[in-house]
Design a protein with these regions (language model features):
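Short structural boundary motif marking the start of a folded domain
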Residues: 1-6
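Extracellular beta-rich ligand/substrate-recognition surface
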Residues: 7-14
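Residues that act as N-cap/strand-start positions at coil-to-secondary-structure junctions
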Residues: 14-17, 137
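Short Gly/Pro-enriched turn/cap motifs at secondary-structure boundaries
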Residues: 21-22, 54-60, 130-135, 141-142
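Glycine-rich beta-strand-centered segment in the early N-terminal region that forms part
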Residues: 22-37, 47-98, 103, 111, ...
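Conserved Rossmann-like nucleotide-cofactor binding loop
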Residues: 40
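NAD(P)H dinucleotide-binding glycine-rich loop of Rossmann-like/cofactor-binding domains
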Residues: 93-151
Length: 151
């Protein structure tokens, strides 16, 4: 599927509107259409080089929209559901999640890694694979995100 997104192709500089391809969702993932995205100071810190990340990466971790497709194993979300994003793709199994501290989930290690929870990427453009900030990349028309980030 084709989409447009605001991409940081280098470690500093402007976000650039680019044409990308989105893969279908994998297990425990959903394909979403973002209707709204928030601009956060984190995005500005990325742009000016204050926060390290693995470019290229689609910006944005605050957004809302509509679920378009669900991957294998997703049972609590259906196509057509409206959602807002949660910045933490909590696992529900680590010691933090089991004590109600999902904001400290072990999955936090993936937030700026540029990969999905399985270590792969769902966005492609200019012959490269792209990551998404906080596994969300809300500065895109469509993206695949972890089902645990859909509220």
């Amino acid at each position: 599927m084709k989409t447009k997104a605001a991409v940081m192709w280098k470690e500093t500089g402007p976000f650039e509107i680019s044409d990308l391809t989105v893969d279908p969702p994998g297990p425990e993932e959903v394909l979403v259409r973002f209707d709204y995205a928030g601009l956060c100071h984190t995005d500005e810190h990325m742009r000016n080089g204050d926060i390290g990340f693995n470019p290229p990466m689609v910006g944005g971790h605050e957004g809302s929209g509509v679920v378009e497709e669900v991957g294998p194993g997703v049972t609590h979300i259906q196509p057509g559901d409206h959602f807002v994003t949660s910045w933490m793709p909590y696992c529900g199994r680590c010691r933090f999640c089991l004590t109600g501290q999902t904001n400290l989930c072990d999955n936090g290690q993936y937030l700026m890694s540029g990969t999905m929870l399985d270590g792969t990427q769902r966005l492609h453009g200019r012959g490269q694979k792209l990551g998404s900030v906080d596994l969300l990349g809300t500065f895109s028309q469509r993206n695949v995100i972890p089902a645990s980030c859909v509220v």
